[in-house]
Amino acid sequence: MKPYEPKSWVTRVFLVWWLTALSCFFISGRLIYLQLLKGKWLKEKALKQQTVTLKTFQPRRNICDRNGIPLAIDTLAYDVFAHPLYFSISIEEVANKLSPILCIDSLSIQKLLKPTSTGICLASQLPENTGKLIASLRLDGIDLIKHPKRYYPYKEIVGNVIGYVDTSHQGQAGIELSCQESLQLNSPTLTSSIDGRGVLISHQIPKELFIQDNLSLQLTLDLELQKIAYKALKQGLENCKGKRGTVLILDPKTGGILTLVALPSYDPNIYYDFPIERFKPWPVTDLYEPGSTFKPLNIAIALETKAISPEDSFYDEGCIRVGDSIITNNDYNSYKPLPCLPNTYNKIVKLLANSSNVGMVHILERIAPEIYHSWLSKLDLGHAASPLETDLPWASESSLKDINEFVCYEIEPAAASFGQGLAMTPIKLAQLYASLANGGILVKPYLVTGLANAAEDTQKAKGIDLPSYNIRKKNLGNHLSWHKAEPSYLFLKRSGIRVTDLLRHIKAEGRFALPFRKNLLQLFTQDAHRTTELQLEPKAHQPQLLRPTRHAVYATNQSKRVFSHETTKLLLDMLEDVIWNGTGSSCFVEGYRIGGKTGTSQKHTQEGGYSKTKIITSFAAIFPTEDPQYVILTVIDEPNIPLSFGSNTAAPIVKSIIESLIDIKKMKPTIPIIKVKKD
């Protein structure tokens, strides 16, 4: 028997070569398939696994008054979500613990919680202190989602001016709407690499994200004056039972709006509880016929055209027919003429002091209608002029009859002589009075000064109505800062949290949730700002103006002259006589020089013509007349007391404001106070 002989080495080599070649063939084929056919898809998949895109949170800029006092600020609110599937205690126990904090009956909470359900919203928009109380309970399956909330500390006092933001943090009214681009910062996106554990690679974070922006939108408003006007108007409306009212205070030299109050107002913090018509800033949107408050402007026009001189006298018969219409003075009695004004000659100052309609008709008869119309157009009245923009939305243009109608119908210039037949917004009339106060310059009213950097980072709270939760100071530079100076990627690394876990539970608008961890639900990008508390103090400090607005530049550089200095000086003296000897005596303040004019006008009806019962009363004042610093206009819509006039409805409101102004500004009397010695 032959011994066993193994196969030759050639056979074995061939077998090894064949197996190796076959393996290389399959490997090469697989590589070709992955590289050429699936390469693009695999590359995209790898990038998705190795990078993460996060949207950083950018709070809105604060809105502050002229002294830097915040009027609108960003703070934090919480939404509470429950996941009964992950409760470590019974539903009843969870409901009992949450009930006193949420102020919801325990049984009602239990009805919402299904044992196998998840993601149940129990409450939303909770203040920060309430959120912290819930977090302190350390309940498994209860998540708190942070999100920004706009807070308005002065509520109805500035509601009509500031406006509000909706649930998506977008401005919907007032300054919040008109200055949306200045208030809303762009939210940059961050694309960064992550390691195999899902932790952000720190050197991938661009330094640009940490650039600070502490700018606030500064207004011309003076909060202290705003409070005074709000209180005076509220009391005045109650006294005269008016439908609505407004107070405007302008700086006649610059056009800056120091005060804009409109009642009834609304609380921007809970805007959804108020009717939608209150969101409109009607002092800049709604037209009305100014009535007798327009008479000083007509006298100024007559003086400028040389149609009259200051010492001229006019026959005032108390009643006059113009075309098919009869015009009477307010105090005229057709059956028994009063001995005061009718059937007498009076100088212009007397006609204005007693608010004579007939006297004004005679004055304007000396001016050709086309010239008078051109002067009204020069004052930017009528459709030819653009709406008077004041940084508030929905501004309206004034109303003036067409020149052909104005010339062909003699009643039109006659009615305009005492402020009827033409219409304007309250802010427009205040602008015209500012031209009388500043020497004849038609300044442009504006509300927004520009973007300013506060002179102080922190102010201490004092005498301000703040909510019970802390208000955080925005620090736009530290977008990715979790706590003071600890970047988020370090927090995630220290906590062992994977970014991939965050991505699985991403929420709307860049909100990242960890719903299955104990009390760990956080907003990754919304702990962007530091936890420094913003404390408020209503004390004056001047912010540094960095970027003035277009309107502010226009007001200082592009104002135009409409009246001469001599004419406005005469008008100031006449308006002062209205306070001393005329219909404005109810605004007299002893020791101080005030100029003003009352106004009462009929309202239009929907059917056409004028209402016999509904009127608008007003009072415009310039204070002090020797050096005008304030133009104050009060308008009352539909006062409902017997014998309602501007003198007994609007003028007392202006007097109250001036008395408060004197007190807070420490203004000394300029006229000797005569004290009568009593026997």
Swiss-Prot record:
GO terms for molecular function: penicillin binding; serine-type D-Ala-D-Ala carboxypeptidase activity. Keywords: Carboxypeptidase, Cell shape, Chloroplast, Hydrolase, Membrane, Peptidoglycan synthesis, Plastid, Protease, Transmembrane, Transmembrane helix. It is found in: Plastid, Chloroplast membrane. It catalyses: Preferential cleavage: (Ac)2-L-Lys-D-Ala-|-D-Ala. Also transpeptidation of peptidyl-alanyl moieties that are N-acyl substituents of D-alanine. The chain crosses the membrane at residues 13-33. It is a single-pass membrane protein. Its EC number is 3.4.16.4. The active site is at S292 (acyl-ester intermediate). One of its GO terms (biological process) is regulation of cell shape. Its main location: plastid. Belongs to the transpeptidase family. The presence of this gene in the chloroplast genome suggests there may be an unsuspected vestigal peptidoglycan layer in this organism's chloroplasts. This is Peptidoglycan D,D-transpeptidase FtsI homolog. The lineage of its organism: Eukaryota, Viridiplantae, Streptophyta, Chlorokybophyceae, Chlorokybales. The gene is ftsI.
